[in-house]
């Protein structure tokens, strides 16, 4: 049976992650309060931010920005958008 969590972002019971995505307390918090759907949505958004804002993951400021935006995104707060991105038409 799939483990479910009360997703902090979507405010409903959804399938949880199979393992913590980070070590330590932050990873445990994400594991216990973020659904697979929210995490997958974050990974897509993270890729957009890295590409559109030309973030360098070797740069500590860029990593800190991304970490802050992840916290906002997963908490359902207002978060940074990828400027200039136009989603493909369906």
Swiss-Prot record:
KW Aminoacyl-tRNA synthetase (keyword) present: no
According to its record, what are the GO cellular component terms? cytosol
Coiled coil (residue ranges): none
Q: Which cysteines are joined by disulfide bonds?
A: none
The residues that cross the membrane are none
Q: Which domain of life is it from?
A: Bacteria
Q: Which UniProt keywords apply?
A: Iron
Against InterPro entries, the record matches this protein to: Fe_traffick_prot_YggX (IPR007457), Fe_traffick_prot_YggX_sf (IPR036766)
Which biological process, per GO, is one annotated for this protein?
cellular response to oxidative stress
Task: Give the function comment from the record.
Answer: Could be a mediator in iron transactions between iron acquisition and iron-requiring processes, such as synthesis and/or repair of Fe-S clusters in biosynthetic enzymes.
Q: Which family does it belong to?
A: Belongs to the Fe(2+)-trafficking protein family.
- Put simply, this protein is called Probable Fe(2+)-trafficking protein
Task: Name its species.
Answer: Pseudomonas syringae pv. tomato (strain ATCC BAA-871 / DC3000)
């Amino acid at each position: 049976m799939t483990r479910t969590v009360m997703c902090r972002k979507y405010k409903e019971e959804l399938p949880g992650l199979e393992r913590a995505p980070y070590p330590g307390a932050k990873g445990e918090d994400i594991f216990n309060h973020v659904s697979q759907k929210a995490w997958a949505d974050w990974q897509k958004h993270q890729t957009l931010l890295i590409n559109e804002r030309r973030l360098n993951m070797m740069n500590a400021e860029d990593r800190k920005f991304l970490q802050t935006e992840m916290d906002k995104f997963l908490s359902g707060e207002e978060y940074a958008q990828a400027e200039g991105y136009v989603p493909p038409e369906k």
